[in-house]
């Protein structure tokens, strides 16, 4: 192996943890500027974050920001030596299996997000990344008519894919137990297959996908045995191997995360995989090792399916999120992932 340090995948932080699960019945949101400062100031042995992934929602962003406004933001991140990667489309006002009007709202929000993303590309700060979606529908509602609801979600995603294709964008559905039609690994694959478009894929979050193993909202899709002992590494690895072999071919985007095997929701957010801090002693994942299950094929070869990876850690208390050390620890975990499963490209 050459002695050049791996410089891919690029290491990104996320803006949405400053908003998700925050609000009136929780803690106040953390400002975009604060998150940018914490990102830029994180450093481990001279290595820093390469970029940020954005949640395109208030109070951080106005999805209909003028070209000039987007340009100003592009100049700002550029001055901070950051790029932008993937964007979260604010689709929750339009459930993908809802009414005709709901579904039109969903597709329109994807369109607006694609336009925002295209402008960032045009202004030279977004070399890679996808538009992140989910079904914006609850598993309980989905389960009243699984076959037709999956068809409806797939039809909405298909329309959204065609709109995204006009902008040269790919859509990635983030598999979480709290989204109908995406609430289990088998439901997720069925939905993706039903969309039948080349620009649809999966966003794998290490915390959320761990709960797929437990069949949390779909007991029949459980992979790990009942009363599984978390000290049994071999069984955990075998479960993750099965899961990643099924979902890896669909994976277009990746969230490095830690999870303690439990679910969590604060504010207006439904219960979903609990994100843990990078060094949480209760974390069930060996972050660097288990990231490799997603970043390498069965034969051990790197997939190189995406040019950046992003940390996702939502619903931490503000006190934790405004400490610089939190982000240094996160960055250190991500550097380990890149050291073990990254590659070098001359730039």
Where are these regions (language model features)?
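Hydrophobic faces of well-ordered beta-strands that scaffold small-molecule active sites
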Residues: 7-14, 50-54, 84-89, 129-133, ...
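A short, acidic, amphipathic alpha-helical segment used as a generic capping/interface helix at domain edges
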Residues: 37, 237-243, 281-304
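Active-site beta-loop-alpha junctions enriched in small/polar residues
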Residues: 14-18, 54-57, 89-92, 136-138, ...
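Aromatic-rich peripheral "rim/lid" segments of glycoside hydrolase catalytic domains that contact
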Residues: 270-271, 276-287, 310-347
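Active-site cleft segment of glycoside hydrolase catalytic domains centered on the general acid/base Glu
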Residues: 139-157, 163-164
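Active-site groove signature of glycoside hydrolases
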Residues: 117-146, 167-178, 311
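Acidic/histidine-rich catalytic cores of soluble enzymes
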Residues: 154-276
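N-terminal pre-domain/capping segments
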Residues: 1-127, 148, 158-159, 165, ...
């Amino acid at each position: 192996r050459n002695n050049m340090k791996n410089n891919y995948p690029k290491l990104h932080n996320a803006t949405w943890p400053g908003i998700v699960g925050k609000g009136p019945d929780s803690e106040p949101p953390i400002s975009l500027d604060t998150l940018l400062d914490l990102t830029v100031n994180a450093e481990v042995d001279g290595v820093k974050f390469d970029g940020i992934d954005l949640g395109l929602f208030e109070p951080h962003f106005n999805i209909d920001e003028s070209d000039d406004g987007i340009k100003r933001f592009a100049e700002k991140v550029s001055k901070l030596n950051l790029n932008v990667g993937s964007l979260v489309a604010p689709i929750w006002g339009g459930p993908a299996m809802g009414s005709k009007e709901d579904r039109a709202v969903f597709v329109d929000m994807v369109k607006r997000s694609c336009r925002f993303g295209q402008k960032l590309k045009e202004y030279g700060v977004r070399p890679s990344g996808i538009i992140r979606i989910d079904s914006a529908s609850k598993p309980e509602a989905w389960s009243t008519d699984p076959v037709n609801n999956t068809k409806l979600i797939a039809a909405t995603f298909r329309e959204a894919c065609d709109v995204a294709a006009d902008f040269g964008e790919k859509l990635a559905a983030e598999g979480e137990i709290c989204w109908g039609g995406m609430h289990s690994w088998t439901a997720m694959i069925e939905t993706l297959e039903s969309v039948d478009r080349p620009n649809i894929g999966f966003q794998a979050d290490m915390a959320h996908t761990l709960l797929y193993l437990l069949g949390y909202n779909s007991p029949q899709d459980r992979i790990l045995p009942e009363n599984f002992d978390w000290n049994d590494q071999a069984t955990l690895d075998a479960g993750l191997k099965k899961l990643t072999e099924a979902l890896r071919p669909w994976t277009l985007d990746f969230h490095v995360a830690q999870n303690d095997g439990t679910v969590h929701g604060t504010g207006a957010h439904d219960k979903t995989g609990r994100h843990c801090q990078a060094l949480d002693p209760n974390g069930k994942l060996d972050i660097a090792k288990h990231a490799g299950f997603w970043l390498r094929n069965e034969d051990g070869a790197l997939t190189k399916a995406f040019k950046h990876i992003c940390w996702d850690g939502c619903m931490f208390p503000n006190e934790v999120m405004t400490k610089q050390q939190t982000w240094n620890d996160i960055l250190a975990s991500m550097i380990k992932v890149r050291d073990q499963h990254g590659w070098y490209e001359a730039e």
